[in-house]
Amino acid sequence: MKRELLLEKIEEYKSLMPWFVLEYYQSKLSVPYSFTTLYEYLKEYKRFFNWLIDSGISDADDIASIHIKTLENLTKKDMESFVLYLRERPSLNTYSKKQGVSQTTINRTLSALSCLYKYLTEEVEGPDGEPYFYRNVMKKISTKKKKETLAARAENIKQKLFLGDETMKFLDYVENEYEVKLSNRAKSSFYKNKERDLAIIALLLSSGVRLSEAVNLDLKDINLKRMVIDVTRKGGQRDSVNMASFARPYLENYLSIRNKRYKAEKQDVALFLTEYRGVPNRIDASSIEKMVAKYSQDFKIRVTPHKLRHTLATRLYDATKSQVLVSHQLGHASTQVTDLYTHIVNDEQKNALDNL
C-alpha cells in the first residue's frame, strides 16, 4: 500500500477509536513502530471492538464510546469466546470455502491485543503515575503455533531461495533475458526502471535487509566505496550493514542515471525513486513486492523480498557456518532466529545418511 493511502487509512481508523487506543497509538509512534504495523494493529482493534459491541459485552453505541473498564473486566472466558468467533465466523473471502480466519490471523489478532493490554497495564502512566489498570487477561490466553519442525519449514523455504549461482543467474536473467518476451510497450516501461530494479534486487540479495529498511534508505545512507549501508532497524535502532561486492556495479549503474531519469532534485533524498508525471517520489514497499514477484516468477518461482533476505542469510551461513555472524548481518539480537538456516544447509546430514 502506498504511503499516502496508508496514512489515510490510519486516520480513518483513528477516528473510530476510543481515547485509550489513541494514546497507545501516539506512544508506539514515538518508539517508533512502523506505520504498516500500526495500521495492522488498528484493523485488529476495530475487529475486536465491533465484536465487544455485537456480543453485548459492551453497551457502547460505537467503538469510540467503549469504556476502558470493559477491557479491565474482560474474563478469560470472554476472550476464549472471541477466539471461537474468529475460528467459526463465515469467511470474508468469497472464493474460500473455509469457515473462520486462519490460525496465523488469529495469532496476529491476539498479538495486537496483547500489545494494547501490556501498554494499559504496565507501560502507561495515569495522573497518579500508575497504569490505568493491572489485570491483564491476555496473559491467560495462549496462541496455537503451527505444527512444523524447523527441518520441515527449511525444506519448504529452500524451494523459494536462489542459492549458489542462482543469485547471479537471477540478476543476469533480469538484466539480459527478461525483456525478450515483452511487447514493445512493456519494454518501454521495463527500460525506464531497469537499472533501479536491478539495484534494488542486488541490494536485497547482497545485504539481507528487510523490505522496510530498503524502502527507507536515503542517498546519504549508502557508501559504495566501503559497500556499507546505514539502516533503521526494528525498534528504531540505527545499524551499519555490509553488502556483498557483487551488488556494486548494479548500484553504480542506477546512481549514474537516477537524477536525470527520475528528475530528482536536491530535496529528493530517497535512494530509490519512482516518477509519475514528472514528480519523483520514494518508491513504496508494495511496488518493490510486485517488482520482485514479477521477475522471480518469470525466472523460476514467485518469491517475496523476504525470501531474498532468507537467500542472503542461507548463503552467508553456508559460507561461514557462523550463526552469530548471520544474526548480526540480519540485525537479530539472538542467534535463535537463525536456527532455520542450519537446517536449510544440511548437506552434511544428507551425506552422512548416504554413507550408512
UniProtKB/Swiss-Prot annotation:
Domain of life: Bacteria
Cellular compartment(s): Cytoplasm
GO MF annotation list: DNA binding; tyrosine-based site-specific recombinase activity
Keyword DNA-binding annotated: yes
InterPro entries: CB, DNA_brk_join_enz, Integrase-like_cat_sf, Integrase_catalytic, Integrase_recombinase_N, Integrase_SAM-like_N, Recomb_XerS, Tyrosine_recombinase_XerCD
Alphabetic keyword roster: Cell cycle, Cell division, Chromosome partition, Cytoplasm, DNA integration, DNA recombination, DNA-binding
Pfam families reported in the protein's UniProt record: Phage_int_SAM_1 (PF02899), Phage_integrase (PF00589)
PROSITE patterns: CB, TYR_RECOMBINASE
Active-site annotation: R210, K234, H306, R309, H332, Y341
Residue stretches making up the Core-binding (CB) domain: 16-121
UniProt domain Tyr recombinase: residue ranges: 169-354
A Gene Ontology cellular-component term: cytoplasm
Primary localization: cytoplasm
Keyword presence, Protein biosynthesis: no
GO BP of this protein: cell division; chromosome segregation; DNA recombination
UniProt note on regulation of activity: FtsK is required for recombination.
NCBIfam families xref list: PRK05084.1 (NF003462)
Similarity field: Belongs to the 'phage' integrase family. XerS subfamily.
HAMAP family associated with the record: Recomb_XerS
Function: Site-specific tyrosine recombinase, which acts by catalyzing the cutting and rejoining of the recombining DNA molecules. Essential to convert dimers of the bacterial chromosome into monomers to permit their segregation at cell division.
Annotated protein name in UniProt: Tyrosine recombinase XerS
Organism listed in the record: Streptococcus thermophilus (strain ATCC BAA-250 / LMG 18311)
